[in-house]
Each structure stands twice: as structure tokens, then as C-alpha cells.
Design a protein with these regions (language model features):
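Short N-terminal edge-element motif at the start of the domain
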Residues: 1-8
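Compact nucleic-acid interaction/catalytic patches
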Residues: 6, 17-55
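Sparse, context-dependent recognition of short Cys/His-centered cofactor- or disulfide-binding micro-motifs
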Residues: 9, 41, 79
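Short beta-strand-centered aromatic/proline hotspots
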Residues: 11-15
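C-terminal terminal-subdomain/extension
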Residues: 44-163
């Protein structure tokens, strides 16, 4: 969820592997067919949303959160479930489209795509930078946890309550 003043906006998407990175491809209420998206349909065949591959970006594994549909209101839960079911039914098409958009953008061939797409290589560089920033924090947190346990064990007699 992203906070927008008094409201939270749920950011929903698909995580898939592209160029050895986890990529997050957002799902949007945008319902117009474009060459850089896949329309998502409900059980009646009506378009309900789309996967926007031009806006996909690499995401560190630690930042990926799984949405619990059961925590949502019934109507919204039904929408999420329909999107999820449809996406699972076309997994191969989704993977193929993500890789196609990624390669086409990086080839520099499609000038319109260059104007309307995220710069995947730059985002990958920034993702690696961010991950290198996170790794020392994780190591410090893990070391701190070990230290705390060692200190607790050493000073156990000092803080135990006599009975």
C-alpha cells in the first residue's frame, strides 16, 4: 500500500524473472489495448484491467510482498481473484511479452517504445545499488541479533529473577 494523504493505494502486479532480475509488472485499471500491455479479462470475457510492461521495474526480493486477498472487502477480493486466475491461465504469454518488451526497448530499434517505456538497464543499475545498500544493513541486523543473544547468555544471572 502507498499512502496518498487519507487513502492507501494498493500497488498490485506480477513478479517475473527478466534478465536475471525479479521484475515487477504493474496491473492497472487501464483497459485500452496497446503493444506494451496485456488485457486481463473476467470470466465473462470483459476487460477488467491490464498488465503494463512498459512500466515494469526490477525489484529486490526483500521488497516483494504477497497480497492476502482475504483481508480485502468482498467486491475487491473478487476482482483480485479474477485477475489472478486469468494471469495464471496465460503465464507463458505474460513471460513472453515481458521478455519481448524488455529486448525490444533495449535494442533501441523502436523509437516510440524508447519514449514511453522505463529505462530497464538504468533501473537494473539502481536496483543493484539499492541491494548493495541493503546487504550491509541486513548483515548488521543479523550480527546485532547474534550479539544480543550472546550478551543475554553471558549476563543471564544478572537479569534473572530469583524465585
Amino acid at each position: 500500500n502507498i499512502n496518498y494523504g487519507t487513502n492507501n493505494k494498493f500497488v498490485c502486479g506480477i513478479v517475473l524473472s527478466v534478465n536475471d532480475f525479479n521484475y515487477f509488472a504493474p496491473i492497472s485499471s487501464f483497459e485500452k489495448q496497446q503493444k506494451t500491455n496485456i488485457l486481463i479479462k473476467n470470466s465473462k470475457g470483459e476487460t477488467i484491467s491490464s498488465i503494463r510492461f512498459s512500466f515494469m521495474f526490477p525489484i529486490p526480493k526483500i521488497e516483494i510482498k504477497i497480497k492476502d486477498f482475504l483481508k480485502e472487502e468482498y467486491k475487491y477480493r473478487r476482482l483480485l481473484l479474477e485477475e489472478w486466475q486469468y494471469c495464471n491461465s496465460i503465464k507463458d504469454k505474460i513471460i513472453s511479452k515481458a521478455n519481448y518488451i524488455y529486448k525490444r526497448y533495449n535494442s533501441g530499434y523502436d523509437k516510440m517504445l524508447l519514449k514511453n517505456c522505463c529505462n530497464f538497464k538504468l533501473l537494473e543499475e539502481k536496483c543493484l545499488e539499492y541491494q548493495s545498500y541493503l546487504e550491509p544493513i541486513e548483515e548488521v541486523a543479523a550480527a546485532r541479533e547474534i550479539e544480543d543473544k550472546d550478551i543475554e547468555e553471558e549476563n543471564k544471572e544478572d537479569w534473572e529473577i530469583e524465585r
